Amino acid sequence: MADPLYSSLKTVNSTSKVTPESLVFQTKILTPEEAKNVINEKIAFKPLLLVPSLNLEKQGDRKESVASKKRKKLSSKEKKKLQLNVVPKIADYSQFKHLHSMWCSYILEVIAGCTGESLMAKLAKAEYQGAYMQVLRSKSTTRVGLEGICIHESKHMLSLITKENRVVRVPKQDSVMKVIVDVPQRKLVFELYTQHLLLRAGDRSNKRFKSKNTIDL
């Protein structure tokens, strides 16, 4: 049996649904009493389902735009294209002195209060870009004695800028480096077996290190 409240409404398509919006529109042709009954029984105190805004954007384009907003870091391909990891052969040593002073402050905070194995673990996970290093021992005798500020560290190589404004590359494998922390309060010197650091600095910070035998060079 048809609802008497809808007897005065205009005929609509059988496929169309009656929505609160259509009811409000149709109440314009009802008597005030009929309109009041429709509103009280069909609309009042009921959740109003809002009609979503019309979006003609394709789903694929929407996913790409969302992905582009989420991605903030450069990919490896983009870094290579921009040559961000390319180390110049010649650079100005004086430009990296401030980097070294910042690194000295950083390493003092890292090793503060550490002794024994905890100190070794901290040094193994530390960042060495900015450290002043000297090659103590190496299988390549031509590299022994090279020293400078580390300006780039990769998985297998250390790049040092010497006081002669020359950039030299030292392999981590089969090398022993002397790291110097020279600050007004004190001067720290320690040996670093870089063959145990064959990881990128970012990956090394999350790795759990275990003591390993060191091959004498």
Curated annotation (Swiss-Prot):
PANTHER family the record matches: RIBONUCLEASE P PROTEIN SUBUNIT P29, RIBONUCLEASE P SUBUNIT P29
A Gene Ontology cellular-component term: ribonuclease MRP complex
Subcellular locations according to the entry: Nucleus, Nucleolus
Similarity annotation: Belongs to the eukaryotic/archaeal RNase P protein component 1 family.
Keywords from the UniProt entry: Hydrolase, Nucleus, tRNA processing
Any one Gene Ontology molecular-function term assigned to this protein's record: ribonuclease P activity
Protein name per its UniProtKB record: Probable ribonuclease P protein subunit 1
GO BP: any one term: tRNA 5'-leader removal
Entry keyword tRNA processing: yes
EC number: 3.1.26.5
